[in-house]
Amino acid sequence: MVSPVTVVKSEGPKLVPFFKATCVYFVLWLPSSSPSWVSTLIKCLPIFCLWLFLLAHGLGFLLAHPSATRIFVGLVFSAVGDAFLIWQDQGYFVHGLLMFAVTHMFYASAFGMQPLALRTGLVMAALSGLCYALLYPCLSGAFTYLVGVYVALIGFMGWRAMAGLRLAGADWRWTELAAGSGALFFIISDLTIALNKFCFPVPYSRALIMSTYYVAQMLVALSAVESREPVEHYRLTKAN
């Protein structure tokens, strides 16, 4: 079992650019009512830094571990989704929604189907159903179906992220905690987006959405560091 102190020492320095980029976003706080390529870059910059965080572990690591590669690809789609959402008032909200739907599919695939954890799946299904029931009266037209599919996808991703979570014992792994926590923060962020867009104005919505979103993406990226594939496979691949 790797201690939290070891994790901070080994991974913390690689995350410094991400923390700096996140601070830049919140310090500048460019108005969302006036989208521009500059505001798009500033919003996407922390995600770009998470690309670099994963690449800092070596291209060989990504190529040897499909789960880490899928998280990297998910981060790429996230950045595209962020760019679309900057321009959502110009008609690109659905484009952003679709990009993040693809992101959740890549993340769920990275987290894998073992262990199955059916009880966790049932809990996530119930929570997803409650979220959709809360949003349903506010939805109309195509969003009635699009939001329903999106809720199902993020709920599935959350199930797979939390399925392997063990909080104690010799089998405890910090990357599982990172994955589960990241999924939870992602759900909070996206639920806030939906409530604010379709139902009612959420106080301080942008600060809540972006803070939980960046934390979620950081935790998901961290979960890729300790790959789900056998370590021996990576060593053999690296040696060859």
Swiss-Prot record:
Gene name for this UniProt entry:
TMEM86A
Q: What is its main location?
A: endoplasmic reticulum
| Segments crossing the lipid bilayer | 22-42, 44-64, 71-91, 93-113, 116-136, 139-159, 175-195, 207-227
Induction comment: Sterol-inducible in the macrophages and the induction is mediated by the liver X receptor (LXR).
Catalytic activities: a 1-O-(1Z-alkenyl)-sn-glycero-3-phosphocholine + H2O = a 2,3-saturated aldehyde + sn-glycerol 3-phosphocholine; a 1-O-(1Z-alkenyl)-sn-glycero-3-phosphoethanolamine + H2O = a 2,3-saturated aldehyde + sn-glycero-3-phosphoethanolamine
Instruction: Write down what this protein is called.
Output: Lysoplasmalogenase TMEM86A
**Tree of life domain:** Eukaryota
The terms describing its cellular component in GO are: endoplasmic reticulum membrane; membrane
Note the coiled coil stretches, chain numbering. none
Describe the function of this protein: Catalyzes the hydrolysis of the vinyl ether bond of choline or ethanolamine lysoplasmalogens, forming fatty aldehyde and glycerophosphocholine or glycerophosphoethanolamine, respectively and is specific for the sn-2-deacylated (lyso) form of plasmalogen. Plays an important role in lysoplasmalogen metabolism in the adipocyte tissue and macrophages.
Q: Which residues lie on this side of the membrane: Cytoplasmic?
A: 1-21, 65-70, 114-115, 160-174, 228-240
Localization, UniProt? Endoplasmic reticulum membrane
Please give, as recorded in its UniProt entry, the membrane topology of this protein: Multi-pass membrane protein
